[in-house]
């Protein structure tokens, strides 16, 4: 694959190949496979984990980084079009990693770029590198990607990690439990996707032990203030679901709690020391997965 802009472009074989390669990087992340390569990280929207893990991935692979983490320092503030920005950066870099606030921006960038483009998140649309690290974390903790029940909790309307994970898991016979208030319920297009792909799901507004005790993966999300135009609506729903340690007491032994981070208050700090809390390790898995993604789009072979 020259570009990775959406998880739906990845077949099951593509996903498993990327995850298998990530395992090699977990065993040895310091492989100088990008010697002489320049990678541009263009972050038009704030990021901590995604940007730092991509930049760490490049550094550990021996490449060099150019770009920006604040769009106000770029020529976009002068009115430069995305097309011109991508075309210009493509003159200097071998790979572009981009986060943008507009849905579809990454796909457009891939259409006008002469070098590979990796989508690091575009609006409320897609976040394929997060999905791949989520899949890596699920396989690592469950021993398989197949036949898992995944409860997705919180902001299912704007949560691009949710949307991407539904599509990414569709190859592996999942069952879903969607937990959200009406204002943040899963968009109809993703419910239709589940129906078209014979993916069983249930919906509920209630986050309780009945949900927690019947899933293998509990995928928590924050309510994203930056997606709201009505702050009163945000205040009304931001704390509607909070996971506490006591709520995990009767959960399945194999249950793991995932979260794309940052958390705001939806996971209490008393959960952190529970062995079922996996979200910090999940973030570390992003390093290995993103090293694998970089090698995928650049066509770099990785030896055992």
From Swiss-Prot:
Catalyzes the condensation of carbamoyl phosphate and aspartate to form carbamoyl aspartate and inorganic phosphate, the committed step in the de novo pyrimidine nucleotide biosynthesis pathway. Its EC number is 2.1.3.2. The keyword Protein biosynthesis does not apply. PANTHER family: ASPARTATE CARBAMOYLTRANSFERASE, ORNITHINE CARBAMOYLTRANSFERASE, MITOCHONDRIAL. The gene is pyrB. Belongs to the aspartate/ornithine carbamoyltransferase superfamily. ATCase family. It catalyses: carbamoyl phosphate + L-aspartate = N-carbamoyl-L-aspartate + phosphate + H(+). Keywords: Pyrimidine biosynthesis, Transferase. This is Aspartate carbamoyltransferase catalytic subunit.
């Amino acid at each position: 694959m020259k570009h990775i802009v959406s998880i739906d472009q990845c077949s099951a074989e593509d996903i498993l190949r990327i995850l298998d390669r990530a395992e090699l990087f977990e065993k040895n992340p310091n492989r100088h496979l990008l010697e002489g390569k320049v990678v541009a990280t263009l972050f038009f929207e704030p990021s901590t984990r995604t940007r730092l893990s991509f930049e760490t991935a490049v550094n550990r692979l021996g490449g060099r980084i150019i770009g920006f983490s604040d769009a106000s320092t770029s020529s976009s503030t002068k009115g430069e079009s995305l097309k011109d920005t991508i075309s210009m950066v493509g003159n200097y870099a071998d790979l572009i990693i981009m986060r943008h606030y507009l849905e579809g921006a990454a796909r457009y960038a891939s259409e006008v770029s002469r070098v590979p483009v990796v989508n690091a998140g575009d609006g409320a649309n897609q976040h394929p590198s997060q999905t791949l690290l989520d899949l890596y974390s699920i396989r690592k903790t469950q021993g398989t990607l197949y036949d898992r029940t995944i409860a997705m909790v919180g902001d299912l309307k704007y949560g691009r990690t949710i949307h991407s994970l539904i599509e990414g898991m569709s190859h592996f016979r999942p069952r879903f439990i969607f937990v959200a208030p009406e204002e943040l319920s899963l968009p109809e297009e993703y419910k239709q996707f589940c129906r078209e792909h014979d993916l069983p799901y249930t919906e509920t507004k209630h986050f309780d032990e009945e949900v927690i005790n019947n899933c293998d993966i509990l995928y928590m999300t924050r309510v994203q203030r930056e997606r709201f135009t009505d702050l009163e609506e945000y205040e009304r729903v931001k704390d509607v679901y909070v996971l506490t340690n006591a709520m995990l007491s009767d959960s399945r032994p194999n249950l793991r709690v995932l979260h794309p981070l940052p958390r705001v208050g939806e996971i209490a700090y008393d959960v952190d020391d529970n062995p079922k809390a996996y979200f910090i390790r999940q973030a570390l898995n992003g390093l290995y997965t993103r090293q694998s993604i970089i090698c995928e789009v650049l066509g770099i072979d990785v030896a055992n």
